[in-house]
């Protein structure tokens, strides 16, 4: 998921938690 930068597996890898 994209809840955290290190566990991200989507194209949102560089977006902050608020930008999900």
UniProtKB/Swiss-Prot annotation:
The modification Sulfotyrosine is found at residue 5. GO terms for biological process: adaptive immune response; blood coagulation; innate immune response. Keywords: Adaptive immunity, Blood coagulation, Coiled coil, Disulfide bond, Hemostasis, Immunity, Innate immunity, Secreted, Sulfation. Conversion of fibrinogen to fibrin is triggered by thrombin, which cleaves fibrinopeptides A and B from alpha and beta chains, and thus exposes the N-terminal polymerization sites responsible for the formation of the soft clot. Disulfide bonds: none annotated. The keyword Disulfide bond applies. The keyword Cell inner membrane does not apply. One of its GO terms (cellular component) is extracellular region. It is found in: Secreted. Its main location: secreted. Transmembrane segments: none annotated. A long coiled coil structure formed by 3 polypeptide chains connects the central nodule to the C-terminal domains (distal nodules). The long C-terminal ends of the alpha chains fold back, contributing a fourth strand to the coiled coil structure. Cleaved by the protease thrombin to yield monomers which, together with fibrinogen alpha (FGA) and fibrinogen gamma (FGG), polymerize to form an insoluble fibrin matrix. Fibrin has a major function in hemostasis as one of the primary components of blood clots. In addition, functions during the early stages of wound repair to stabilize the lesion and guide cell migration during re-epithelialization. Was originally thought to be essential for platelet aggregation, based on in vitro studies using anticoagulated blood. Heterohexamer; disulfide linked. Contains 2 sets of 3 non-identical chains (alpha, beta and gamma). The 2 heterotrimers are in head to head conformation with the N-termini in a small central domain. This is Fibrinogen beta chain. It comes from Ovis aries. The gene is FGB.
